[in-house]
């Protein structure tokens, strides 16, 4: 049999002249090993955050049954078993769309931050009530129509007396609790 010349494929009209490497580059998306490890570590961290949630908070997160059972098991076990279980949860999270889970976690965190902001606003309002006069009381009554002016004035007066006499701030706390109850009922 005759040996074909090395440039034979250039002479053959049926041969596709495009290099094979270019075709493969279009189809294959190359991901580095480090990136895969970073993604796995991020999923493990997400799994740890899920394990740290309470049962009521877990109900608000969209999880399948197998993942939820694994999280509940991880909450029960200790030390090395917990680490292995979190690793397993990370593996399960690879097969699940993580975006809805992350969104639910963000909502839970933001809700907590919003509650803290409301408490800070109430503390500022309490301080303004004690330091201010009738204008601040009118502002509170306008903000919370079900507020009792007489009770507000009594709590403010008692808080001022306690502050002047250097007594424990019982009325100070009662005033805050009253404002908190008003904000929750509004």
Swiss-Prot record:
GO terms for molecular function: ribosome binding; rRNA binding. GO terms for biological process: assembly of large subunit precursor of preribosome. Gene3D superfamilies: PSPTO4464-like domains. One of its GO terms (cellular component) is cytosol. Keywords: Cytoplasm, Ribosome biogenesis, RNA-binding, rRNA-binding. Coiled coil: none annotated. CDD domains: YjgA-like. Belongs to the DarP family. This is Dual-action ribosomal maturation protein DarP. Pfam families: DarP. The keyword Zinc-finger does not apply. InterPro entries: DarP, DarP_sf.
